[in-house]
Amino acid sequence: MTNSFQNSRRDLRERAFQALFNIEMGAELLAASQFAYGYDKVTREDAQVLELPIFLLSLVTGVNNHKEELDNLISTHLKKGWSLERLTLTDKTLLRLGLFEIKYFDETPDRVALNEIIEVAKKYSDETSAKFINGLLSQYVSEAPSANKS
């Protein structure tokens, strides 16, 4: 991985997904974020705590702090017969992350946030899940475009 990719917003979204997934498995927020950001950057001889990018911390902290609200939004956009509990942890985490950025990051256009989370979904899930995530987030964006930013 090049340094420019490691510090790109796409890479930081991917690392936020990894941290959030680890938090769901019981990890502490800061430790999960530090590991997700630094696991491939630090060698044993050069072990040091890396300064976490604000964008990464904002995503992880924001999703974690708004999880109940995000889960309610996801639930309201699920088709009849589906529940949040039926979704895989990967899909739930990706949906939370995508919804959070769409809803709370004014500097990121909704379509950019949507496309970026779909790219992460393609890497960590299958094509069916990526299409499902795309459909749910697209529905959210199209239903209330002016009300999505809080």
Swiss-Prot record:
It comes from the Bacteria. Gene3D superfamilies: NusB-like (1.10.940.10). GO terms for molecular function: RNA binding. One of its GO terms (biological process) is transcription antitermination. The keyword Transcription applies. One of its GO terms (cellular component) is cytosol. Keywords: RNA-binding, Transcription, Transcription antitermination, Transcription regulation. Transmembrane segments: none annotated. Belongs to the NusB family. Involved in transcription antitermination. Required for transcription of ribosomal RNA (rRNA) genes. Binds specifically to the boxA antiterminator sequence of the ribosomal RNA (rrn) operons. This is Transcription antitermination protein NusB. It comes from Streptococcus pyogenes serotype M2 (strain MGAS10270).
